[in-house]
Amino acid sequence: MTDLQSIAPRDKAEILAQALPYIRKFHGKTIVIKYGGNAMTDPALQADFAEDVVLLKLVGMNPVVVHGGGPQIETALKRLGKQGHFIQGMRVTDAETMEVVEWVLAGEVQQDIVGLINQAGGKAVGLTGRDGGLIRARKLKMVDKDDPSKEHDIGQVGDIVSIDPSVVKALQDDAFIPVISPLGFGEENESYNINADVVASKLATVLKAEKLMMLTNIPGVLNKSGALIPELTAREIDELVVDGTISGGMLPKIAGAIDAAKSGVNAVHIVDGRVPHAMLLEILTEQAYGTMIRSH
């Protein structure tokens, strides 16, 4: 793993020189970042992430952070004696779990991220789907992947109806960094827990983002031998889903990546969030730290 603090000054200068063309290329562009995995729970990686986001803003890009919070939600549920349950990579969310999800995501995780970014010199503002009517949602209908005639009731898990990016754009124009919790609201003002990968993908599409970066706990998409696949098309991904290579929690992440790529996001990267500054190195150098998804 590459740690920028361990790099010699001359090598750092070369990295900065390499970064200049990318800074020019992506100046003024929106970069949507799905922040999750170890990068959210390791204090050193948290600090690295905040610094990277601030640096992207300072060099003229517009980072938008969409965060997860699975481990933190799981910890809170265990404290309450409640067992988490997943179906096809989605958390089953009853009314009691929904209260925990809202409290953990908007009241704990989001505020921690906002604080870290502000501490690193940025101006972060926390949002949920309710703020400015950002994310309207409805109850997700989950069809069984093996039996299409069967549906699973997974509670207050939301399917995005629409995204109004006005509040995000207003914050960007005023030099703020939006930090978004994946919570939506329905017609009756009910709350919905929405998969953060899906929110990041849809938001990247609506904002016409240059890149969608998905930080995760693995090197990227791996083949059955455990080797990294550096680049994939939508068709190749379909084959990996059918043969079981891609499964579980990776399914919504991959579905979101394909959706964004097909909807006009120029580049979608699933990045190894365990590597210090991996996101920054992925954007500003020729080095790759994950899998790039393209539509064809």
Curated annotation (Swiss-Prot):
Top-rank EC class of the record's enzyme: transferase
InterPro entries given in the database record: AceGlu_kinase-like_sf, AcgluKinase_fam, ArgB, Asp/Glu/Uridylate_kinase, Glu/AcGlu_kinase, NAGK-C
Family stated for the protein in its record: Belongs to the acetylglutamate kinase family. ArgB subfamily.
NCBIfam families, per the entry: argB (TIGR00761)
GO cellular component, one term: cytoplasm
UniProt GO MF annotations: acetylglutamate kinase activity; ATP binding
Protein name: Acetylglutamate kinase
Pathway info: Amino-acid biosynthesis; L-arginine biosynthesis; N(2)-acetyl-L-ornithine from L-glutamate: step 2/4
Pfam family, one: AA_kinase
Residues binding substrate: G69, G70, R91, N193
Residue ranges the record marks as coiled coil: none
Naturally occurring in which organism (per UniProt): Paracidovorax citrulli (strain AAC00-1) (Acidovorax citrulli)
Gene: argB
Keyword flag Amino-acid biosynthesis: yes
One of the protein's GO biological processes: L-arginine biosynthetic process
Subcellular compartments: Cytoplasm
Function: Catalyzes the ATP-dependent phosphorylation of N-acetyl-L-glutamate.
Keyword line: Amino-acid biosynthesis, Arginine biosynthesis, ATP-binding, Cytoplasm, Kinase, Nucleotide-binding, Transferase
UniProt catalytic activity: N-acetyl-L-glutamate + ATP = N-acetyl-L-glutamyl 5-phosphate + ADP
Site (Transition state stabilizer): K34, K253
Record-listed E.C. numbers: 2.7.2.8
